[in-house]
Amino acid sequence: MIRHTAMRLLAAVMLLAAACEKDPDPQIRISVQEILLPGNATGEAAFTVTADAAWGLTYSGEGFSVSPSSGSAGETTVTVSPTEANTEKSRRQLGTITIHFFAGKQDYGIPVSQRPATASRTVLLYMPGRDLITFYKENIAKIREAVTAEIPGDGRMLVCYQPRQHATAEMLELRYDPSTGTCESIPLTTYEDFNAGRPEDVQQVFTDAAAYAPAERYGLIIGCHGKAWIPASSGVLPRSVRPGTVSDVWTPVPGALPTRSFGDTGYELDIGELAAILEALPLRFDYLVFDDCFMASIETLYDLRTAVDYVVASPCEIMAAGFPYDRIVPHLFDEQADLRTQLNEICREFWYFYQYDWDTISGNEQSGCISLAVMSELDALAAEMRRVSSAAKQDFERAELQYYKGGNTKLFYDLGQFVALSCGDAGVADAFAAQMERAFPTGQRYHTPNYYSAYNGRLNPISYYTGVTTSEPETTEPYATDCRQTAWYRATH
């Protein structure tokens, strides 16, 4: 009796063990929780279904197609294609894809939506040249960090740079991919015969940006070497080595930290050429952000006054690391803020980074000056400057002026202080200062206590700051003569 009972218990244990060792329940994995289709009718999106058994799908809604409609055990790629463009101003919900997992007797819904064919805003970051390529790649990496499911939202973020050589350029889009949960680089086009110093090539890049990413509004960032209004070398010797010029003008001192001032000689545009390019485009950029040195120069900005609405720029050198793109990109696509607020936040983020976080990047310095120019106010500023030029003069020492470039040849002096020191008519000087406030609002003038210059290799104190420079006080040739040929000087004297 005892033996029979033991045998029955053993059999029960064996049956229980067998039950525990039965095949596990079939599993299915779907790589996305939602599908976001491009706004036009030519793109597509894809996701993968990985399953232990057969599955099928159905979909409801309109404006898209799905293939294939079923799969077996293993991994299957499913492609979702829009069948028409989204002509609305915002995303539209197209429908739902439902995955039917027969073995598991479960259904999985995936919502499908489509971006607008015309983006709310397209921003192009144009970074020509090769000398700063390491920093350009770091800038792109920072943008990738900023791109999420919400940023740029229904906007488009494009980049054009020269990762291979001076004779080629590549344009790509940085876009969030729901299937991977990361920012992806989408190649748009390659330019095989490209010269950043050739106006027609640059114009083509800007035109293509609108063709590949049409938008209601456009923004432009130019990140490269900058020398304000100083004429480009255009393939000839730079001015710093021409006979009769001061040899140190564009030569950094030994051991200087890298800034965005020097390099890529022979691949430069004059500011007048850039203005002509922008004026000729079939689109208009609302703003231009210069991630370049010295571009907050009145001689420079006056040439651009009818080409864009706003310019963000620095009166001094910008460290080679450039703007903190992970911090400014969210503001560029902030649909809840007006444009002036967005641009103020860009200025503030630039200053904050160089004021407090500059040492998070090797080879950096606590040096960041920035301002916002309201371009529609520059003609009125020129009119006030004509009154200054005609008014009584008062003597001052040029050494009193706040300058923004190291070395023996300073070149760039604070415009507001120059007028305050040189104008002998208090009423005229006050009227000029009032117009300066409209053209360069105080609330968008930011600076660190000092600025770094590679031309003397050190930090230089800032005691007076209006956010914009002039080269009129410069006496060194040929710059003194060249300055008198600028449109700003001719309009104000």
Regions of interest found by a model, annotated:
Residues 90-104:
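A short beta-strand micro-motif common to beta-rich folds, especially ectodomain repeats
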Residues 25-30, 50-77:
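Surface-exposed binding patches on compact interaction domains or structured appendages
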Residues 116-215:
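N-terminal extension/subdomain marker
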Residues 129-132, 163-167, 193-194, 224-230, ...:
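Solvent-exposed loop/turn segments at secondary-structure junctions
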Residues 2, 12-37, 65, 102-118:
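Bacterial Sec-dependent N-terminal signal peptides
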Residues 77-94:
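Extracellular/luminal low-complexity segments enriched in Ser/Thr/Pro
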Residues 246-493:
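Terminal, contiguous helix-loop blocks that mediate binding/assembly
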Residues 162-188, 222-265:
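Surface-exposed loop and adjacent secondary-structure segments within mature catalytic domains
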